[in-house]
Amino acid sequence: MIESFGDRATEDLYHGRFSARVKRFPKEILSAALRKMDMLNAACFLEDLKAPPGNKLEALRGDMKGFHSIRVNVRWRIVFEWRGGGAHDVSLVDYH
């Protein structure tokens, strides 16, 4: 379940508020990003995100240690911290 968002743009997108902040995201990834956030919200366990394999769930390292990501496409990721059975600080980020 999504417990909190890491930025207002991601929160606005998820809640259907197509604000100026949301316009920074490419239009072609919006539906896929929403679908991935719906999967994240439905997850009861981190392992639930291993399917489908296209999510490519991975634990991040370095400055992002403690965070995980799932892929939206080659360039964009949903990044979050999984604690207490939920996703915290959820953000849609350009990973490259």
Residue ranges and their predicted role:
Residues 1-72, 83-96:
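Basic, Lys/Arg-enriched alpha-helical interface segments
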Residues 75-77:
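Short, surface-exposed coil-to-beta transition loops
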Residues 80:
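Catalytic-pocket segment enriched in acidic/His residues
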